[in-house]
Every structure is written in structure tokens, then in C-alpha cells.
């Protein structure tokens, strides 16, 4: 269910604002989105895993907070661009 360090590094390279950017909200949203998609695939097989479902809801809440921060700090344009890149929402 967790993502590999190679996958994290590739996400960091794609969504980083500057070189060696590991903690920006853009990178964290990308990593959280990957974890959420992995858990979603897990639930297609294990429908009754309620313990992990709580973890999924926590991850979704964290991503929502980062997205709100991006929208507030960097503007609606950066927010919409990130959502399109990640493939979430409308």
C-alpha cells in the first residue's frame, strides 16, 4: 500500500518548485494523491477493510488542507493547474 522511494523521487522531480524540493505543498499533494489512489485500488479487492478506510479519509483531509493552502497562497490558477496535473476533481 505504501509507495516506493523511487516513485516518491519521480513525483518530487515532476512537482518540485525548485531543485531539491521535498516538502512543498505541491509535492506533498502529489505524494498524497498517489497514496490515495493506491488505497482506492486496495478497496476494490478488500471491501470490508474499515480500518484502512479511516486512514484513507485522513489522507484525503490532509490533501484537502494542502490544496486549500495552495489556492490561498499561490492563487486559483496554480490550484487549477495542479488539480489538472494530478487528475483529481472535475
UniProtKB/Swiss-Prot annotation:
Gene3D superfamilies: 6.10.250.3130, S15/NS1, RNA-binding. One of its GO terms (molecular function) is structural constituent of ribosome. GO terms for cellular component: cytosolic small ribosomal subunit. One of its GO terms (biological process) is translation. Keywords: Ribonucleoprotein, Ribosomal protein, RNA-binding, rRNA-binding. Part of the 30S ribosomal subunit. Forms a bridge to the 50S subunit in the 70S ribosome, contacting the 23S rRNA. Belongs to the universal ribosomal protein uS15 family. One of the primary rRNA binding proteins, it binds directly to 16S rRNA where it helps nucleate assembly of the platform of the 30S subunit by binding and bridging several RNA helices of the 16S rRNA. HAMAP family: Ribosomal_uS15_B. This is Small ribosomal subunit protein uS15. It comes from Wolbachia pipientis wMel.
Amino acid at each position: 500500500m505504501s509507495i516506493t522511494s523511487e516513485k516518491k523521487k519521480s513525483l518530487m522531480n515532476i512537482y518540485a518548485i525548485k531543485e531539491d524540493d521535498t516538502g512543498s505543498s505541491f509535492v506533498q499533494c502529489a505524494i498524497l494523491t498517489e497514496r490515495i489512489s493506491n488505497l482506492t485500488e486496495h478497496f476494490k479487492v478488500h471491501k470490508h477493510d474499515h480500518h484502512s478506510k479511516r486512514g484513507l479519509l485522513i489522507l484525503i483531509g490532509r490533501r484537502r488542507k494542502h490544496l486549500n493552502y495552495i489556492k490561498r497562497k499561490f492563487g486559483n490558477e496554480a490550484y487549477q493547474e495542479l488539480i489538472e496535473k494530478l487528475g483529481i476533481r472535475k
